[in-house]
């Protein structure tokens, strides 16, 4: 998403909107966006970007500094039309990055708005997006794969099964953070994890536990000086952090869930979902 001109699928989507051949490859809530996909790429409000000339029409494209966006067919400016009028005719809405935490309408990789999710849960999209990977194995270029965060997928089990079939059961490891005592699910078609749990064990070998007392004392002094509350029990820290994420950088996703549930899009519903 960060460089639409380098991604033919995304470029076609921005050009043709819902009518794009590749529209089904991306998970976009078109209705919430008023029929447009919202792109949080601006450093200011769009009116200010237009007023300063940072946003401009350049041939058959909209330009914002180094960012390029296609104009929809038939949407080029006529005489005396300003850039905001042209922008209003596009299948995308350029908006300030400050809105990304609560106003996005496309699925992304966790809180990284520059990485739009591809709907690999759809067999046709999987086949189209993994053809090159299949060729690597057919040509003997690679022997295995690392899959980043499969839990971020809509259907991780089915995805790994398709990947296993595509690669003829090649060596595949997944980036999955396991809790202490947790094991990789047996139903994952994978040979193991990327090793974070092993790294945690190695860390314990290399770190002197006698330093804990000194670090705890330093933490207490800093909390007293800064006015921070006393240390909370670890489960409370985890629960509070998860809630902060749901109410912060992933609020767009929480709002999407409330809409998918058919529930009111208000603070009370968001709180219940989080």
Protein language model regions, located:
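Acidic/aromatic-lined carbohydrate-recognition and catalytic surfaces
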Residues: 1-107, 139, 149-222
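Conserved alpha/beta catalytic core and glycan-binding cleft of carbohydrate-active enzymes
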Residues: 29, 183-274
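N-terminal small/glycine-rich loop or linker at the start of catalytic domains
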Residues: 101-120
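The substrate-binding groove and active-site-proximal loops of carbohydrate-active enzymes
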Residues: 114-123, 146-151
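A conditional alpha-helix N-cap/helix-loop micro-motif detector
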Residues: 122-126, 250
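Structured alpha-helical segments in the cores of large, soluble enzyme domains
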Residues: 125-138
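A conserved hydrophobic secondary-structure block that centers on an alpha-helix together
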Residues: 135-147
